[in-house]
Amino acid sequence: MAAPAPAFTAPFPPSAAPVVVDPPASSVPAFLRPLEAAYLRFEAARDRLGLADPGKYEDLGREVKLTHLTNYTFDGARADLSKTLSQVPAFQVTHSFAAGGAAGPMGGVNPGTYNFGAVYATSKTFMQGMVDNEGSVTGRFNYGWSPRDTTKMSVQLAASAAAPSMFSLEHDRVGKDYTASLKAYNPSPADLTGSYIGAYLQSLTPHFAVGVEALYQRQGEVEDCSLGYIAKWHDVKKDEAGAALKDSWIATAQVMAQGMWQATYWKKLAPSIDAGVDLLCVPALSPRDRKAVATAGVKYDFRTATFRGQVDSTGKVSALLEQRLSPAFAFTVAGEIDHIKNTSKFGVGVAIDSASEEAMAAAMNAGPQAPPPI
């Protein structure tokens, strides 16, 4: 009797047999499908390059601004008293006092100013408001629709007619290898007056990006339109915490739509030392109106202090030291000498930050939170 033929089984049990799924039908009309196929091939080629987004237009030269003390220096006496009322969501109020500076009326000594501010922030919303002793009000509102899309609004209401009020609306889009932004200052839908700025940056290589800026202004019957161009070179390596490592650098060059030229260079010299250089040129037909200012600065980060030093081509030498004596108390000293005008400025300030017991308890029990859309 012949042996029975061997039995063969399928390579997969019936429940695990592979299922062939037809690709989804394209919703594009037939006559546009060649364009769709070309676009998909183009997107696949972009993905293979592995390019990262070049950063937002408004952040060009941000590292240099953080290194220099132009946005931090002051003169006279200043005190900031802050209290954190909540950690999740973040809610903080601040009382700011200033006196003795050179920003007083008619160029005299400032007799004293007071500002009250409040900040509220979540992972999707950021709100900030401030009012001073003269009644001027400023406010900001940011909303993050997604990690890649953010809408921003700001308003400034001046107490006196001499200072103009302002309203701005902005939207930022961060793509895989590009960034785009649209901004409008004092827009009027009725007659389309106002200032409108559009910017686009595109990464071409992992270390190089180019962009364009368009400016359109309309005030009454006067219209103006101009273009600007941007280039950015960078080689930034970061640690696990997101901080830049030694020898990281960023260089930018910009021909602004307003006609000015600007170039910046920033480098991480050491884990606690940053250096930055900025060159700003204002071309003009008349040699008397042509201006150029070069600024070089350095920042040292110590365990409980930060020192900034700066010198520029106009003869100004300035320095700022912020000493944090405790987590809730900081002492700041700022000074500037203008060798050309033979003038000097000096400032001293304190900052006190406190938190309620409820806020501290909530912070200890809360998990990691996403940063607000600033």
Task: For each feature predicted by the language model, list its residue ranges.
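Detector for outer-membrane/organellar transmembrane beta-barrel domains
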Residues: A199-D301
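Repeated loop/turn-to-beta-strand initiation elements of outer-membrane beta-barrel proteins
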Residues: K124-M127, R148-M153, G175-L182, P206-V212, ...
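Outer-membrane beta-barrel "beta-signal"
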Residues: Y229-W233, A294-V298, A319, K341-I374
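Outer-membrane beta-barrel proteins
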Residues: G104-M106, M127-G129, F141, A159, ...
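Transmembrane beta-strands of outer-membrane beta-barrel pores
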Residues: F97-G101, T122, N133-G135, W145-P147, ...
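Residues that define the transmembrane beta-barrel architecture of outer-membrane proteins
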Residues: N110-Y114, N133-V137, A163-F167, K176, ...
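Residues on the lipid-exposed face of transmembrane beta-strands in outer-membrane beta-barrel proteins
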Residues: F116-Y120, G139-Y143, L169-R173, G198-Q202, ...
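Transmembrane beta-barrel domains of Gram-negative outer membranes and organellar outer membranes
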Residues: A2-N186, A351-D353
